[in-house]
């Protein structure tokens, strides 16, 4: 007997059911299952840098619908949760929250106390930043990330993620550090990781190197400047166009296309730089664009990546003039020897790029070495995706992992790995392949920051006190994790640190992607729990945003290819962005995000999940509270329709043999088709289509079918007809609740409890075969349309006449083809009762669109 409450409500369901799910271990992973029984998910670890926004809710809901569906189909779902709590976003959050700045030169203060005004922006601004040691800074990072992670978990629970909360990790925890360091050392041993001193992209704000995958183009205002170089072979002036006149002292050559007739006579000669008087060669290179500027360009070390290519391929010297803070260095390059050149450089030294540019332009104009005025332009400039100043290129010693950027064979092998994965939607594979094909260098993984996984190496120092970079001291895997800045290598003691004949520790940390690229290994227990690893890896699903295919997805594929010679997952499910009202991506950096807590409280978690699940795979979706209102209305309707159906059906069992009425049989046949469609959609990771079709059926069920059979269900046509309606209501409601369960876990759990002892989230997914095996083979589901459309016309007539739907229809005449009339005749009694029709006349008339004429009773 169903226990239906008098006044069901959706309020408070989240706390009630989260407590029950946790207590009963509904989502606890059973690791005794075999690999073929397990569906493992490589859950994205959200960045711990403050708060989650609706974009997170959007994409994580998509993952959860798949997890819940798989669980109901009988799979044992491995669904862990991680926290990405190292890297620049976390550092910035800690820096702002506590009002501190890390100074690695300061000693550790064991008695350092957390600032009392933490989180108070006004107080921090008034007192200014406090400089702290690296270790003290890392301690503060740990304090804040623990608080943030708990807040994240609370919100995920409120949203209803069916995660096994006993299986969590943080990318900075000891286990993750050990796995990341071990993987790096194995890359190093196999020659897949290497260190080199070379030009690298550099963010002057964060003072760290940046990888190609972390770049973005931004439109910036600039200007072209025409400078006069002077031929050293009596060929007169050579005019070049540049947007970077401040790099003139770094000029090492001029280049032109070898086939450009205008400058062929200059190839092999030299030119003198204006102001600085340095002789530079004039060379040919196919990358020089005859259509750009004057067709001849200066090569500087370094203005952009093309300069790097020219420098490398033409074997040019380095004349670096920009330091790591984005200012002009103090000492002029050795090539500048003239008094005029040295005096000019002294005026630029120490200045920012902007100020140095103004200075050199003035000098050029005063010396009449510039043609005309600067010509303003807008052009794309490379930025670090988290930075706010244009990137520079500086020469530095960095660590790299091979990723196919300089190895054609590896490049093709990684593209082929994409063929081993199913992509949802399929066209996203093109983004993966295109990214790999466009790589121009290996993966730079070292960062000059503070809170991250240390690169686990030391270097020997020779007797002269020089670091011998090639003589690395490598720890044993059993010693990991280690921090070279505080740990001492075997065979040495602390007194030998930074001393001749001793050692130095590697000061760089790994890029956060270097750890996140190992999430399958971390989640599955690589090298730590081989039994778990064998049961869960390769994983079944990688859900993520389409914008980080080039970073997270690709880097994970690289690490898995190098370590396991396999693709890390079988399926890649891509979510789109959330767009603001101006159709721009929501992001913290743009300041246009909406935090989800208030939405979850206001509309309920099921309503917010409904909005999220309507976003199709890979498609950008607008933030729309209107959709949440619809979702809330749907959840309430499920409660009320379930109460009505279960109350009406009483103790009826789901016995298909009791379904004898043609309308009931047609509904169940249509339900069977829905189940087949929803199942196919979920199997293809198209949760949105499964929801759309289920919702369409549900509203037809409640608005039309229930109204049509209501009187019959109350017994107006006898016990057999009533039982047919009761059984159909029970079977349909049972299936619909299970179809809705992945999307609306709270309201479906609540209703299921009224008539079941088990959890709906462990109940079997409905199948078409179980529903149709007890039904007649030939059922015309057009009967449903004939019945509902006829009833709708009767209702419309009453509504247009501004009469109550309960008012009697004196006469209703249905004119249609014989086929249609035969269908309407099958539901004659239900139509008469549902429409309160005194006389229903059916007229056969071939070749016309069905017509319904309604005559209402006179008003009393």
Go through each PLM region and give its residues:
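Feature 926 captures the class I aminoacyl-tRNA synthetase adenylation module centered on the KMSKS loop
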Residues: 226, 431, 439-514, 518, ...
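Short secondary-structure boundary/capping segments
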Residues: 59, 92-100, 210-212, 257-258, ...
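Short, polar/flexible loop-turn hinges at active-site or ligand-entry regions and domain interfaces
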Residues: 100-106, 134-139, 349, 421-422, ...
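Active-site-adjacent bridging/hinge elements
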Residues: 35-43, 65, 120-128, 153-160, ...
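Charged, glycine/proline-rich intrinsically disordered loops and linkers
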Residues: 99-135, 336-348, 469-497
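Structured ligand/cofactor/substrate-binding pocket environments in proteins
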Residues: 55-67, 83-84, 176-179, 237-363, ...
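N-terminal, positively charged nucleic-acid-binding surface of large information/translation enzymes
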Residues: 1-259, 300-334, 367-411, 437-440, ...
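Short Cys/His-rich metal-coordination motifs, predominantly Zn2+-binding knuckles/fingers
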Residues: 206, 276, 387-389, 461-464, ...
């Amino acid at each position: 007997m169903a226990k239906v409450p008098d006044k069901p409500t959706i309020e408070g369901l989240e706390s009630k059911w989260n407590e029950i799910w946790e207590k009963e271990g509904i989502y606890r992973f059973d690791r005794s299952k075999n690999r073929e029984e397990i569906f493992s998910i490589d859950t994205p670890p959200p960045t711990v840098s403050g708060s989650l926004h609706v974009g997170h809710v959007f994409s994580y809901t998509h993952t959860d619908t798949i997890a819940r569906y798989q669980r109901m189909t009988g799979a044992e779902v491995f669904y862990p949760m991680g926290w990405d709590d190292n890297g620049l976003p976390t550092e910035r959050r800690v820096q702002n929250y506590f009002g501190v700045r890390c100074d690695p030169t300061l000693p550790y203060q064991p008695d350092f106390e957390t600032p009392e005004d933490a989180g108070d922006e006004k107080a921090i601004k008034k007192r200014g930043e406090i400089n702290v040691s690296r270790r003290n800074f890392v301690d503060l990072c740990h304090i804040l990330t623990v608080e943030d992670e708990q807040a994240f978990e609370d919100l995920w629970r409120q949203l209803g993620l069916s995660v096994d909360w006993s299986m969590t990790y943080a990318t900075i925890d000891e286990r993750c550090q050990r796995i990341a360091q071990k993987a790096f050392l194995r890359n190093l041993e196999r020659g897949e990781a290497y260190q080199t001193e070379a030009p690298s992209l550099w963010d002057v704000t964060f003072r760290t190197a940046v990888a190609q995958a972390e770049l973005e183009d931004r439109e910036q205002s600039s200007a072209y400047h025409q400078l006069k170089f002077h031929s050293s072979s009596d060929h007169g002036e050579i005019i070049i166009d540049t947007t970077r006149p401040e790099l003139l002292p770094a000029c090492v050559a001029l280049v032109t296309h070898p086939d450009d007739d205008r400058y062929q006579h200059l190839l092999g000669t030299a030119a003198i730089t204006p102001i600085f008087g340095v002789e530079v060669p004039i060379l040919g290179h196919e990358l020089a664009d005859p259509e750009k500027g004057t067709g001849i360009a200066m090569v500087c070390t370094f203005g952009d990546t093309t300069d790097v290519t020219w420098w490398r391929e033409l074997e040019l010297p380095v004349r670096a003039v920009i330091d790591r803070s984005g200012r002009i260095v103090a000492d002029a390059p050795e090539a500048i020897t003239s008094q005029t050149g040295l005096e000019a450089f002294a005026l630029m030294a120490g200045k920012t790029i902007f100020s140095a540019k103004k200075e050199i332009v003035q000098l050029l104009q005063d010396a009449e070495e510039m043609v005309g005025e600067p010509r303003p332009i807008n052009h794309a400039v490379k930025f670090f995706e988290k930075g706010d100043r244009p990137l520079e290129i500086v020469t530095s010693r960095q660590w790299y992992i091979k990723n196919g950027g300089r190895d054609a064979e590896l490049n093709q092998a990684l593209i082929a790995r994409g063929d081993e994965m199913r992509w949802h939607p399929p066209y996203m594979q093109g983004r993966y392949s295109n990214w790999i094909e466009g790589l121009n260098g290996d993966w730079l993984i070292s960062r000059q920051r503070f809170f991250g996984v240390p690169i686990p190496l030391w270097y020997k120092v020779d007797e002269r006190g020089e670091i011998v970079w090639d003589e690395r001291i490598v720890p044993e895997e059993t010693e990991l994790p280690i921090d070279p800045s505080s740990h001492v290598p075997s065979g040495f003691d602390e007194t030998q640190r930074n001393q001749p004949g001793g050692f130095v520790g590697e000061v760089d940390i790994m890029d956060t992607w270097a750890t996140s690229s190992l999430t399958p290994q971390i989640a599955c227990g690589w090298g730590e729990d081989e039994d778990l690893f064998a049961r869960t890896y390769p994983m079944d699903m990688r859900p993520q945003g389409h914008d980080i295919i080039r970073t997270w997805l690709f880097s994970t594929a690289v690490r898995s290819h190098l370590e396991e010679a396999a693709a890390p997952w079988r399926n890649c499910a891509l979510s789109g962005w959330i767009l603001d009202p101006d159709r721009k991506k929501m992001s913290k950096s743009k300041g246009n995000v909406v935090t989800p807590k208030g939405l979850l409280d206001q509309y309920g978690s099921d309503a917010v999940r409904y909005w999220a699940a309507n976003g199709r795979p890979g498609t950008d979706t607008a933030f729309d509270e209107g959709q949440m209102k619809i979702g809330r209305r749907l959840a309430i309707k499920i409660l009320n329709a379930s109460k009505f159906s279960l109350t009406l059906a009483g103790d009826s069992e789901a016995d298909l043999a009791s379904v004898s009425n043609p309308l009931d049989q047609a509904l169940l046949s249509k339900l069977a088709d829905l189940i087949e469609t929803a199942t196919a959609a979920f199997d293809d990771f198209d949760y949105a289509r499964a929801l759309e079709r289920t919702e369409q059926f549900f509203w037809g069920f409640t608005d039309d079918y229930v109204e049509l059979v209501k009187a019959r269900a109350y017994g107006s046509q006898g016990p057999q007809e009533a039982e047919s309606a009761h059984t159909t209501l029970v079977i349909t409601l049972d299936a619909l609740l299970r179809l809705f369960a992945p999307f609306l876990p709270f309201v479906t759990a609540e209703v299921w409890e009224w008539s079941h002892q088990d959890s709906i989230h462990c109940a079997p997914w409905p199948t078409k075969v179980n529903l149709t095996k007890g039904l007649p083979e030939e059922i015309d589901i057009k009967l449903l349309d004939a019945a509902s459309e006829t009833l709708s016309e009767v209702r419309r007539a009453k509504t247009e006449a501004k009469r109550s739907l309960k008012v009697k229809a004196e006469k209703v005449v249905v004119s249609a083809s014989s086929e249609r009339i035969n269908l309407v005749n099958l539901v004659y009694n239900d139509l008469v009762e549902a429409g309160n029709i005194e006389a229903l006349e059916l007229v056969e008339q071939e070749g016309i669109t069905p017509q319904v004429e309604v005559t209402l009773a006179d008003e009393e």
